[in-house]
């Protein structure tokens, strides 16, 4: 997850911090191409045009809300760190799930291809 894409919204009067990242739809496909095909000598890559299956595309936006307990002192920086960590966990779980879906689809396709040879 690129932290530069994270937007924080701070509501001190409600003791709430919201962290959000957008434009994540094709992140799993981009990550697959970067991790698994970057060192390939061919021009092979997954195209976002051909990977419109819901199993491969991530939600567009991820967000988390962190609330400060009434007995605690509201600390904006601490809240932002906590929100960022929770957002990163949520995003990473989804990314890993979608990468696994891509790898499973490739595995199934290779199995079918091998059976046709």
Residue spans of the language-model regions?
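Catalytic phosphate/metal-binding cores of nucleic-acid and nucleotide-processing enzymes, i.e., regions
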Residues: 1-117
């Amino acid at each position: 997850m690129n932290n530069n894409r994270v937007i924080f919204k701070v509501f001190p009067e409600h003791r709430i911090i919201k962290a959000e990242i957008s434009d994540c739809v094709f992140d799993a496909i981009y990550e697959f191409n970067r991790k698994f095909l970057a060192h390939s000598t061919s021009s092979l890559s997954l195209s976002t045009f051909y990977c419109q299956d819901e199993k491969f595309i991530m939600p567009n936006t991820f967000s988390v809300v962190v609330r400060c307990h009434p007995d605690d002192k509201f600390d904006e920086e601490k809240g932002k760190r906590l929100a960022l960590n929770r957002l990163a966990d949520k995003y990473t779980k989804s990314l890993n799930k979608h990468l696994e879906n891509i790898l499973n689809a490739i595995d199934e396709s290779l199995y079918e291809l091998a059976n046709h040879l």
